[in-house]
């Protein structure tokens, strides 16, 4: 009986430990130096605005402002190919009916695109489209896009109107919410957005960049709550399992657990003059220290990929410690 109780206690302890790790545990990371090809295809990676996403195979897609468009790396960091248009600001990869697609925001071109993984365009939402009836079309400079399971499209117009615009699955304008301001329920550069299914009801997780906070909104555009404040210009968000990663333009990367607590912070740059510094030359970079994190993604093992806003192009990897 004694041995049975001991075994049961051990099993419960192990179960609790696994449950904690799978839910809201702290995460530890080690930096992986020189993981990505420095000069993919024999050319400089930059300039990059700095979006990053992963496909199901683990390939890494990084946006550039070069004629190559989006550079694609293997999970081992080897350059594979270049696809799609240049000047993509942020991107999300989503699987639909067995096929993966890229959703891309292009603020300087005033459009949102749906692309195949080879870069072929499927459709676009553009201010120039006469069939679109959304307001402030002359201010349409979208920073990011996400898609709900029902096909609804949410566009963070952070460089334009400072509203999040909602379109139905057929790309027809439905509504908008937010608007410019510093108070709760308003945006000062809504710069990143993701659909979040981890809570009791589906929500949108929005990076309110210049207000230095991340927050929840419901799918009808009702403000729910601030999740974390006093961040350093959160630029984007990617969710994997119980965790969400936020690259902060002011030289840091933060990972939040499902409950909003801080699970890890990476690449913290103590030098204020190097933060959000597009032109910082490579000879001033420090291994494992970020300068201008702009896009990020978590792989299935919770390893972290970060792309920077950089004239020269800079992509990082941190490996989770198990």
Question: What residue spans do the PLM features occupy?
Answer:
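Conserved beta-propeller blade signature
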Residues: 59-62, 101-103, 152-156, 203-206, ...
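A short helix->beta-strand "capping" segment at the edge of beta-propeller domains
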Residues: 23-45, 278-286
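Short loop/turn segments immediately following the C-termini of beta-strands
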Residues: 65, 107, 158-160, 198, ...
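Beta-propeller fold detector
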Residues: 30-37, 80-85, 122-129, 174-179, ...
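Beta-rich, blade/repeat-based domains predominating
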Residues: 41-57, 85-99, 130-152, 182-203, ...
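Beta-strand-rich domains and repeat architectures in extracellular enzymes and scaffolds
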Residues: 33-68, 312-314
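Blade-level signature of beta-propeller repeat domains, shared across WD40, Kelch, NHL, RCC1
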Residues: 289-322
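WD40 beta-propeller blade core
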Residues: 71, 113, 123, 154, ...
């Amino acid at each position: 009986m004694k041995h049975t109780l001991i075994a049961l206690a051990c099993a419960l302890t192990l179960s609790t430990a696994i449950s904690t790790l799978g839910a809201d545990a702290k995460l530890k990371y080690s930096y992986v130096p020189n993981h990505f090809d420095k000069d993919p295809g024999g050319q400089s990676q930059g300039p990059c605005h700095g979006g990053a996403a992963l496909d199901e195979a683990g390939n890494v897609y990084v946006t550039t402002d070069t004629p190559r468009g989006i550079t694609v790396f293997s999970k081992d960091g080897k350059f594979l190919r270049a696809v799609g248009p240049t000047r993509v600001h942020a991107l999300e990869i989503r699987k639909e009916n067995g096929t993966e697609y890229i959703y891309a925001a292009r603020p300087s071109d005033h459009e949102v695109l749906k692309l195949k993984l080879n870069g072929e365009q499927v459709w676009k939402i553009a201010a120039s489209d006469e069939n679109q009836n959304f307001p402030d079309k002359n201010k349409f400079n979208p920073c990011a896009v996400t898609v709900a399971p029902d096909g609804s499209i949410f566009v963070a117009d952070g460089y334009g109107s400072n509203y999040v615009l909602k379109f139905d699955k057929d790309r027809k304008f439905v509504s908008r919410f937010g608007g410019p301001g510093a108070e709760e329920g308003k945006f000062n550069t809504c710069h990143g957005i993701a659909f979040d299914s981890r809570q009791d009801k589906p929500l949108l997780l929005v990076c309110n960049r210049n207000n230095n906070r991340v927050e929840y909104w419901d799918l009808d555009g009702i403000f729910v709550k601030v999740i974390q404040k006093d961040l350093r210009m959160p630029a984007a968000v990617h969710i994997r399992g119980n965790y969400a990663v936020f690259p902060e333009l002011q030289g840091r990367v933060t990972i939040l657990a499902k409950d909003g607590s801080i699970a890890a912070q990476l690449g913290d740059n103590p030098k204020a003059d190097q933060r959000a510094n597009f032109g910082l030359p490579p000879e001033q970079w420090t291994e494992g220290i970020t300068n201008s994190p702009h896009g990020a993604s978590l792989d299935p093992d919770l390893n972290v990929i970060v792309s920077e806003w950089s004239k020269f192009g800079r992509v990082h990897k941190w490996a989770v410690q198990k």
